[in-house]
Design a protein with these regions (language model features):
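Structured alpha-helical
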Residues: 1-108
Length: 108
């Protein structure tokens, strides 16, 4: 890992459901994931700093993970979300999931 990233990222392709308070849920496609957050493809514009709830499937969990997150950056085709607090079971399940994924190459 290089740069400012604290957590290793992993390439994946899973659906992501995003809920902003008082607005309709929308979906995106996760490009990569780490213990720190998610980058997803979507055509929905979300301003920096927006707080959301993310819902996504992690194979080791019986139910979808529902995680509070904050928009840290946005591009025309996608959004980077930083997770709030993850529960211990979610950290464990994500680490199990990562064992089957390919690490995302570091940014140069």
């Amino acid at each position: 890992m290089t740069g400012r990233r604290v957590h290793e990222r992993y390439d994946c392709d899973i659906p992501l459901h995003v809920q902003r308070e008082g607005e309709e849920e929308f979906t995106g496609e996760v490009v990569n994931i780490s213990l720190g957050g998610i980058y997803c493809l979507t055509d929905v514009t979300i301003p920096y700093g927006t707080e959301v709830k993310l819902r996504f499937r992690v194979p080791a969990l019986k139910e979808d993970a529902i995680v509070a997150a904050t928009v840290r950056w946005a591009k025309p085709d996608g959004v980077g979300f930083q997770f709030g607090s993850l529960r211990a079971i979610e950290v464990w399940a994500l680490n199990q999931f990562f064992k089957n994924l390919t690490p995302t190459p570091p940014l140069d």
